């Protein structure tokens, strides 16, 4: 499945939660979901009964859309999560949070994960001082993530950092805002990752 490129706010209304796909509008309270907290379309306010499979599939689609991950990549991450010790669902979320594009977003260098992915793919991000343009790269504990010198004054990066001041930085990351770099200090615990995803349903789906 290719990445979704349609009306993202309509998508958020379908899932009934914010997927952090629209940066400034989400923070301003002016998103379509804030105004109409029900599904899109003529019958959007009706609550249709959904099967167990439908709920599981919807949860997987929600996670993929939120993080901007293709089906192939998502399944690959699940396989790795299942291989690791511990709870597969928690491993899944923790692995996804380690993706470079997501870490750039979490550090506040971009207002959305999509924008963070563009920064990475266009070569604007350094990992331990070396350019890395692979969004799916798993960041390791202790690694330094930095915006390239020429990009530090970019208006979108500066604006993103200003908006991040409203929401704060997650506890497993330290950021030097003035110098536009951050340290991925440790792997997050599941309870620290605030995302509207029931990973248990995704595990059930892939375990069939």
UniProtKB/Swiss-Prot annotation:
Transmembrane segments: none annotated. SUPFAM superfamilies: Alpha-L RNA-binding motif. GO terms for biological process: ribosomal small subunit biogenesis; translation. It comes from the Bacteria. This is Small ribosomal subunit protein uS4. The keyword rRNA-binding applies. The gene is rpsD. Residues 31-51 are annotated as: Disordered. The lineage of its organism: Bacteria, Pseudomonadati, Campylobacterota, Epsilonproteobacteria, Campylobacterales.
